[in-house]
Curated annotation (Swiss-Prot):
Homomultimerizes to form the nucleocapsid. May bind host exportin-1/XPO1. Binds to viral genomic RNA. Protein-RNA contacts are mediated by a combination of electrostatic interactions between positively charged residues and the phosphate backbone and planar interactions between aromatic side chains and bases. GO terms for cellular component: helical viral capsid; host cell; host cell nucleus; ribonucleoprotein complex; viral nucleocapsid. This is Nucleoprotein. Belongs to the influenza viruses nucleoprotein family. Late in virus-infected cells, may be cleaved from a 56-kDa protein to a 53-kDa protein by a cellular caspase. This cleavage might be a marker for the onset of apoptosis in infected cells or have a specific function in virus host interaction. Keywords: Capsid protein, Helical capsid protein, Host nucleus, Host-virus interaction, Ribonucleoprotein, RNA-binding, Viral nucleoprotein, Viral penetration into host nucleus, Virion, Virus entry into host cell. GO terms for biological process: symbiont entry into host cell; viral penetration into host nucleus. It comes from Influenza A virus (strain A/Gull/Massachusetts/26/1980 H13N6). The gene is NP. Residues 1-22 are annotated as: Disordered. The keyword Transferase does not apply. It comes from the Viruses.
Length: 498
């Protein structure tokens, strides 16, 4: 890990701030979520939403997407230069759900982008408040991570679907800034780089000319972001090589895929933040809570506290299980899609099931779905304990590259041991040891072979009672470690079929 001195905390990235002390960070993060809350309240007024309609997570998502679209300058410029029939580039919209005569009905609203920008700025003391926009993007990204497995995207770039725990933030837009880069997984960065290299191989002009120079700068910047996520010298040295390559091609792609595989054991440092839907901040602001004065943190007790007393509803399709829908949203709120299910279950206080056993589809409702049969139910987003979010891959001691947990990218800084079948993973590395980086490859493989599964990750770190806001009495949970607790695969359960 680079010395912490050179790193800004992710709250600072989140709020675009320079160095601040803890109180200033809490205040500026508070200002950010307070602005989101004020914006949401104003939008509910504009759209004449009742209290219950304003607490509907689907309405929250539509409003969030509208404001993100209003500030998407690149796309707006593109739309204005390439007008398509029947679409006004100056407007954006989406489905708003209202309660009419005991039924939920869908209404498509259209809104002026300029007007949305005005309302957003007004809620944020006249500023653009990019940090708040990024925060919403990360919430959407976390929801996607909990809902979908990006198997096809993996296969397209030549990666293995078993690497799904490296794919945090794979749907984050490019414009999500430093805060977005902090939450992207190793696999996500590798995938972005591979796509870029492939374009360069297919398009002779990709790296040439004035545009090519900018492309090259972007390529090197992405390499540096990925390098910063690795915690061992050999992995970093390999990234330097990929970055400095004169003409990136298949050799670099091979190296990147190798590095992604190595990250299954030698875990990268990926940040986790609890980003909640806008309506949750809106509810708190409406009840008179002053986020800026009280201060707020995305990685401490605050989001747990907020969810303890927020009532959020969701539309439920006829054959969906409301408890399963709640689990999906709870995981998204805490960025826990790649956390060990046993750790999540302990914190939540109810059993968290693998994705394959959930009878629920995504949160958003497609425009062709029948509203007649749609019900709504309250999402259960409360927890029994809280825990500090981590940015480390769960490596115990930085001196020796000890293992992180395979198929799990830890979200919570909670002690667990590392059950993994080293043979399974090492099988991924049979194949070509040749190539120009064979010495580094050998070094990385040696570290992986020497990492001991009996090591404990996050030694002594525990969870805390919700009354323990200063985190004074850690409770170290004990887990049945007989099997891996991966949400997407390591479950020994039957395949779930509808």
């Amino acid at each position: 890990m680079a010395s912490q001195g050179t790193k800004r905390s992710y709250e600072q990235m989140e709020t675009g701030g320079e160095r601040q002390n803890a109180n200033e960070i809490r205040a500026s993060v508070g200002r950010m979520v307070g602005g989101i809350g004020r914006f949401y309240i104003q939008m509910c007024t504009e759209l004449k939403l009742s209290d219950n309609e304003g607490r509907l997570i689907q309405n929250s998502i539509t409003i969030e997407r509208m404001v993100l679209s209003a500030f998407d300058e690149r796309r707006n410029k593109y739309l204005e230069e390439h007008p398509s029939t029947g679409r006004d580039p100056k407007k954006t919209g989406g489905p708003i759900y209202r309660r009419r005569d005991g039924k939920w009905v869908r209404e498509l609203v259209l809104y002026d982008k300029e007007e949305l920008r005005r309302i957003w700025r007004q809620a944020n003391n006249g500023e653009d408040a990019t940090a708040g926009l990024t925060h919403l993007m990360i919430w959407h990204s976390n929801l996607n991570d909990a809902t979908y497995q990006r198997t096809r995207a993996h296969v397209r770039t030549g990666m293995d679907p078993r690497m799904c725990s490296l794919m945090q933030g794979s749907t984050l837009p490019r414009r999500s800034g430093a805060a977005g880069a902090a939450v992207k997984g190793v696999g996500t960065m590798v995938m972005e780089l591979i796509r870029m290299i492939k374009r360069g191989v297919n398009d002779r002009n990709f790296w040439r000319g004035e545009n090519g120079r900018r492309t090259r700068i972007a390529y090197e910047r992405m390499c540096n972001i990925l390098k910063g996520k690795f915690q061992t010298a050999a992995q970093r040295a390999m990234m330097d090589q990929v970055r400095e390559s004169r003409n990136p091609g298949n050799a670099e792609i091979e190296d990147l895929i190798f590095l992604a595989r190595s990250a299954l054991i030698l875990r990268g440092a990926v940040a986790h933040k609890s980003c909640l839907p806008a309506c949750v901040y809106g509810l708190a602001v409406a009840s008179g809570y002053d986020f800026e004065r009280e201060g707020y943190s995305l990685v401490g007790i605050d989001p747990f506290r907020l969810l303890q007393n927020s009532q959020v509803f969701s539309l439920i399709r006829p054959n969906e299980n409301p408890a399963h829908k709640s689990q999906l949203v709870w995981m998204a709120c805490h960025s826990a899609a790649f956390e060990d299910l046993r750790v999540s279950s302990f914190i939540r206080g109810t059993r968290v099931l693998p994705r394959g056993q959930l009878s629920t589809r995504g949160v958003q409702i497609a425009s062709n779905e029948n509203m007649e049969t749609m019900n709504s139910s309250t999402l259960e987003l409360r927890s029994k304990y809280w825990a500090i979010r981590t940015r480390s891959g769960g490596n115990t001691n930085q001196q020796r590259a000890s293992a992180g947990q395979v198929s799990v990218q830890p979200t919570f800084s909670v002690q667990r041991n590392l059950p993994f079948e080293r043979a399974t993973i090492m099988a991924a590395f049979t194949g070509n040891p040749e190539g120009r980086t064979s010495d580094m490859r050998t070094e990385i493989i040696r570290m992986m072979e020497n990492s001991r599964p009996e090591d404990v990750s996050f030694q002594g770190r525990g969870v805390f009672e919700l009354s323990d806001e200063k985190a004074t009495n850690p409770i170290v949970p004990s887990f049945d470690m007989s099997n891996e607790g991966s949400y997407f695969f390591g479950d020994n359960a039957e395949e779930y079929d509808n």
